[in-house]
């Protein structure tokens, strides 16, 4: 009931979002796409939803196209969204929320638009599922992937949702025990869904921890989670705007940010920023955040990212901002 699938047959346990997307790419993309078809993704994708489709394009002869964000706002211009209307697009894959820009791309209208022109839609929910309610039936996406470790469960557990009729039409991604019905010397029949895609001994501990995390999140409620995250992001952005050496990546309006803020510190490499903050007990992410093409497109070598969840406090945000002021001082700047 967490993402409102129609049946448990539509829920497949994987290791993470990356494996879920690879499953779709291998079991659907490589067998259902061909030369002349187009795969459409966005420049804002995590590598798991980009490199996978590069490979499918290379193996099938399909063409890989991109929707580009506006470099100033981070949103998709209508001129770029018109690419969805191309009838040659047979598969459209994109993230509901960017893990760099922090933007919720409002997937439902994009899904409807893609379906109107005959495309299958793969939605990466890794950055959205921990922070907002998800209803795959209302969204009407064909596939939806997310990870447990981003929402308080143990690592190594993920989920792929797929419409039952599509999953039934796909070959298994992995072969082995438990995904079979009958095995003979020259042929095998496969088990019913979801076991068909769950070969071998499953990570039971991870699945149990994911269920516990879901129940915990549901007990708190997404209204409270979103309200707390909005308070934290607002406080962070307001503080950063007062620091002239900080460049915020993507929108600076907290209403357009979902639980994270990516930024640059003028004159200081992101890895140095992380090292200095780490010495003060603050953990941030630095580098490309598995979104190198987006950084290249934006003309950014690398960036820092501060992520917030409901367990963070406004006092922690204030501490982070205070220590951020010290970063350039440590590097010898006199601000």
Give the ranges of each region predicted by the language model.
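Pyridoxal 5′-phosphate
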Residues: 1-335
């Amino acid at each position: 009931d967490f993402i409102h699938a129609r049946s448990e047959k539509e829920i497949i346990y994987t290791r993470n979002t990356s494996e879920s997307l690879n499953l779709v790419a291998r079991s659907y993309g490589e067998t259902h796409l061909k030369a002349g078809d187009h795969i459409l993704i966005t420049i804002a994708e995590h590598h798991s939803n980009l490199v996978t489709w590069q490979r499918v394009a290379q193996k099938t002869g399909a063409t890989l196209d991109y929707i580009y964000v506006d470099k100033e706002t981070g949103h998709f211009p209508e001129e770029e969204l018109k690419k969805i209307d191309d009838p040659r697009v047979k598969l459209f894959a994109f993230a509901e929320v960017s893990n760099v820009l922090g933007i919720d791309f409002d997937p439902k209208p994009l899904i409807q638009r893609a379906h109107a022109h005959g495309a299958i839609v793969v939605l990466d929910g890794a950055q959205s599922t921990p922070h907002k309610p998800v209803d795959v039936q209302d969204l009407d996406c064909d596939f939806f992937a997310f990870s447990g470790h981003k929402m308080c469960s143990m690592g190594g557990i993920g989920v792929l949702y797929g419409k039952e009729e599509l999953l039934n039409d796909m070959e298994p991604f992995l072969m082995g025990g438990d995904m079979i019905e009958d095995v003979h010397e020259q042929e095998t029949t496969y088990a019913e869904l979801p076991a068909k895609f769950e070969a071998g001994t499953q990570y039971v501990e991870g699945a149990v921890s994911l269920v516990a995390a879901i129940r915990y999140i549901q007990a708190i409620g997404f209204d409270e989670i979103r309200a707390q995250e909005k308070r934290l992001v607002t406080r962070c952005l307001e503080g950063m705007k007062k620091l002239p050496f900080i460049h915020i990546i993507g929108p600076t309006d907290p209403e357009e940010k979902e639980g994270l803020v990516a930024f640059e510190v003028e004159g200081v490499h992101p890895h140095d920023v992380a090292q200095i903050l780490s010495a003060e007990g603050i953990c941030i992410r630095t580098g490309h955040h598995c979104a190198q093409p987006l950084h290249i497109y934006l003309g950014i070598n690398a960036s820092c990212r501060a992520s917030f969840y409901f367990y963070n406090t406004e006092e922690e945000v204030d501490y982070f901002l205070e220590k951020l002021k010290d970063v350039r001082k440590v590097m010898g700047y006199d601000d």
